[in-house]
């Protein structure tokens, strides 16, 4: 029976719960070519200086926005061309979400990691389609699932012939418009054998908390990120923007890009200590 790979290679980066931390970062949604290049360039320069592996993330379509009138992104066709150019310019892998089986084939021709959104993490046909592309698959744990429920989700991808899968913790529903991060989830997810990612920015989201959009508590991103890295993870997922308060989506939980380097430096120190002790 196929098992998940404990080490997942993406370009020159290896995601492993036992190896140094890697970073998945970028703005919530792709806004324009110029904005994508600005964000990727700034993060790439920083991560090269710090010596941490970097995967650029952004969404071409925010398909689960709270309101019908909310901005969703620039669309699949435009985004794929920009992602291709970003890879050539900055030599970094790309992660983006897929929402349908048909998107998996299209996106996998350009992108390195297919991300399964939390709300869709039990959709068998989507998971199988993502698995069959051969791309690395990052599955976000649904806010409605216990960590041990993710073992069966993981098996849907692995038993479809793709052992290169990662599990991402992004918080659990805790009453209305609230999420909580239970750090016990991380060792439980690790026990299934796949690399574990902690999404520190969506974990402070307040889903639908502003009526027509989601709120968030940006001030707690670092607290949760420190805790997760201390427990031990393969990677940290952070959404960032030069002006989060005016971003088209998820602004309240994104961190300012000007604050990113200090945060990553801190997390790398916690990661180094945690993995030495373990």
UniProtKB/Swiss-Prot annotation:
Record EC number: 2.5.1.55
Pathway of action: Carbohydrate biosynthesis; 3-deoxy-D-manno-octulosonate biosynthesis; 3-deoxy-D-manno-octulosonate from D-ribulose 5-phosphate: step 2/3; Bacterial outer membrane biogenesis; lipopolysaccharide biosynthesis
Keyword rRNA processing: no
Subcellular compartments: Cytoplasm
Record InterPro entries: Aldolase_TIM, DAHP1/KDSA, KDO8P_synthase
Catalytic activity from the UniProt record: D-arabinose 5-phosphate + phosphoenolpyruvate + H2O = 3-deoxy-alpha-D-manno-2-octulosonate-8-phosphate + phosphate
Pfam family, one: DAHP_synth_1
GO molecular function: 3-deoxy-8-phosphooctulonate synthase activity
Keywords: Cytoplasm, Lipopolysaccharide biosynthesis, Transferase
Residue ranges the record marks as coiled coil: none
A GO cellular component entry from the record: cytoplasm
Any single GO BP term: keto-3-deoxy-D-manno-octulosonic acid biosynthetic process
Claim: Cytoplasm is one of the keywords in the record: yes
HAMAP family found in the cross-reference section: KDO8P_synth
Similarity-based family: Belongs to the KdsA family.
PANTHER family hit by this protein: PHOSPHO-2-DEHYDRO-3-DEOXYHEPTONATE ALDOLASE
Name by which UniProt lists this protein: 2-dehydro-3-deoxyphosphooctonate aldolase
Organism: Bartonella tribocorum (strain CIP 105476 / IBS 506)
Native organism taxonomy: Bacteria, Pseudomonadati, Pseudomonadota, Alphaproteobacteria, Hyphomicrobiales
